[in-house]
């Protein structure tokens, strides 16, 4: 039902809305929890995408619709790629690709900075709002997920493993 509603009624503005935290809750597919838990398979999603691309809803700009379909199909493929990488390289979420660089950077596991980051109390309004939204709903769009991890690792200089584990626990 959620996939059908996405492809038939919420899909018109997919590309313009997916990056914006204010519009992405409606404009994104929000299928990640269904895919992760196995309620929905990638095969089902790909089939629905193919069907939608061949038979766009009446009254839509077909070129725009197909551009959105192709972009969504690409995201589903990238999701599969990264799931496969994590399954093949099981230490990827614990060990850096370049351990020498991690050692040279000397990140500090500062508890105060970590808690401020994790609770959305950094003092940066946009970041804090995104973190509080994730904590309340269990979902945030992909650009904001990347921003949250970047703030932890590159701005607050926290170990990326701990912040990554924390984010993973928050996602539905």
Label the predicted regions.
Residues 66, 137, 141-146, 160:
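Alpha-helix N-cap/helix-initiation sites
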Residues 29-32, 71, 112-115, 125-135, ...:
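Contiguous, well-ordered alpha-helical segments that form the cores/surfaces of helical PPI scaffolds
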Residues 93, 99-105, 146-172:
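Active/binding-pocket-proximal capping segment
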Residues 15-18, 60, 109-120, 125-139:
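Active-site-adjacent structural elements in folded domains
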Residues 50, 54, 81, 87, ...:
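Hydrophobic alpha-helix feature that most strongly marks membrane-spanning transmembrane helices
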Residues 24-27, 46-47, 105-111, 144-147:
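Short acidic (Asp/Glu) and glycine-rich catalytic loops that position anionic groups and cofactors
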């Amino acid at each position: 039902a959620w996939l059908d509603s996405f492809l038939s009624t919420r899909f018109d503005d997919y590309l313009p809305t997916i990056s914006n935290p204010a519009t992405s809750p409606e404009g994104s597919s929000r299928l990640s929890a269904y895919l992760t838990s196995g309620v929905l398979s990638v095969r089902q999603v790909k089939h629905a995408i193919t069907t939608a691309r061949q038979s766009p809803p009446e009254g839509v700009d077909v070129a725009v619709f197909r551009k959105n379909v192709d972009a969504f199909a690409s995201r589903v493929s990238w999701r599969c790629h990264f799931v496969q990488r994590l399954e093949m390289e099981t230490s990827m979420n614990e060990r850096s690709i370049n351990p020498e660089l991690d050692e040279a950077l000397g990140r500090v596991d500062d508890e105060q900075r970590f808690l401020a980051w994790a609770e959305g109390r950094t003092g940066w309004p946009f970041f804090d709002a995104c973190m509080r939204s994730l904590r309340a709903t269990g979902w945030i769009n992909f650009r904001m997920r990347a921003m949250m991890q970047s703030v932890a690792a590159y701005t607050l200089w926290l170990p990326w493993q701990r912040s990554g584990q924390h984010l993973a626990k928050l996602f539905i």
